[in-house]
Amino acid sequence: GLASRNSALPTTAMATMMSTPVKLDYLVVGFLSFEGIIQDLADITSLEIHEEMGLAEVTLARPFTPPTRRVFTSGCSGGITFSLALQPYPPILSEELLRPEQVYPLMRQLFEACTLYMATRGVHGAALSDGEKLLIAAEDVGRHNALDKIMGEALLKEIPTRGRILLSTGRISSEMLRKGAHMGTPFIISRTSPTSLAIEGAKQLGITLI
């Protein structure tokens, strides 16, 4: 579970997520970023992970009221979001190029980095790349969570995401596309076909789906 608080208000339950219990700090920070709850790390006063309780407790620098409407995203692990809107994100104007011969080597690197995925096929993997090598890789039972971990690690390690390439073993749905738009990635590569909503959204956002 994820709970938030600030110095003036009591603890508030924010969300309950199913997750592979590794890199939970990255998961929480990425989730908060994608949902627009934080803009940068300065918005987090403290973060405590209580693994034995399955709880992450975040102290925010400013008051936050959780939306009453929660949307459960597509996928077998049932991700959660407070918004599915693409409108906040302007089209990505990028001069970055991706050659066809780069795609397969990058996917091979993703598979090599995702050892649990290769061993079990029971989790999803995701990665951020500069076109030649992987900068970050993460695995989770949920494909949405894997992207949250990528975003969280990028923020905590100050690794730029804009203009990079996002890779995933999972299907690119409209919710996954929204996360790519948030990161500013002009290319999203997946081993599975995207949904029709993702294709339409990608046209609006200037994102190439492969």
Task: List each model region and its residues.
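Intrinsically disordered, low-complexity regions enriched in acidic/Ser/Thr/Pro/Gln residues
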Residues: 1-129, 136-137
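Short, surface-exposed, charged/polar-biased interaction segments
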Residues: 49, 124-127, 131, 171, ...
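A mid-sequence, solvent-exposed acidic-amphipathic segment
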Residues: 111-169
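Short alpha-helix boundary/capping segments
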Residues: 19, 138-142, 194
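Surface-exposed beta-strand edges and their flanking turn/coil or helix-capping segments
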Residues: 28-32, 42, 70-73, 141, ...
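Feature captures the catalytic cores and cofactor-binding loops of soluble hydro-lyases/lyases
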Residues: 144-210
